[in-house]
């Protein structure tokens, strides 16, 4: 069984930070509060929680399966119980998907582009990250981060985002771990073969960052996170760069790659 890495109906998030709960990366440590400036938190009052990435002053990138009603988007957030002075809250003005029905598969088109209701201002804790110029190289060291579970299968949830490093692996490694994968897909296989480090529940939609560019979007993985020889699957952003840039430029009829 595979696990879509979004947390739903597990917690009711309140507008008061002191009452909010959170989720994070297994095997990582607390992120430096000054080094996740593009990281966004997506949530609603019914308990759906995801990550996202600021790629433009008006645009956030996330996973299609993170679409939710009454979405709120926070940027510049670190400790859920102790808000930063420069953090900003936004709502979606538009959402764009590769498929009109908002469908996706476990290996294709799990991507959502969100236009914010108003631009964000750059600050010490908020700044967009670059889209990829090329796909990441095999064995590249990349960064994962988010408010996702830090233990699995018995999940625990701290108040701060966790960060960790993982490697880009051969796609065949994920095919061996998850037999349902096709021979080719628009996803990246990334993780640590020995296990112990992984994205998990609540990290969906968050970034896989390689060399200062967003190369992947947290999509799905094993039901128990951080198992040996069971890496995570990430939407391959470089395959969608033209679509993303066209939408941002105002071409809302742009189509995704087949």
Swiss-Prot record:
One Pfam family named in its UniProt record: Trypsin
Organism of derivation: Echis ocellatus
Signal peptide: 1-18
Listed name of the protein: Serine protease sp-Eoc49
Domain Peptidase S1: 25-249
Assembly: Monomer.
Sugar attachment sites: 44, 79, 103, 154, 251
Calcium keyword on record: no
A GO CC term attached to the entry: extracellular region
PANTHER family reported in the protein's UniProt record: KALLIKREIN-1, KALLIKREIN-RELATED
GO biological process, one term: proteolysis
CDD domains noted in UniProt: Tryp_SPc
Location in or out of the cell: Secreted
Enzyme Commission (EC) number: 3.4.21.-
Active site, UniProt feature: 65 (charge relay system), 110 (charge relay system), 204 (charge relay system)
SMART domains given in the database record: Tryp_SPc (SM00020)
Tissue specificity statement from the Swiss-Prot or TrEMBL entry: Expressed by the venom gland.
Chain's role: Snake venom serine protease that may act in the hemostasis system of the prey.
Membership in a protein family: Belongs to the peptidase S1 family. Snake venom subfamily.
Broad EC category: hydrolase
Disulfide bridge positions per record: 50-66, 142-210, 174-189, 200-225
GO molecular function: serine-type endopeptidase activity; toxin activity
Domain of life: Eukaryota
Key words, A-Z: Disulfide bond, Glycoprotein, Hemostasis impairing toxin, Hydrolase, Protease, Secreted, Serine protease, Signal, Toxin
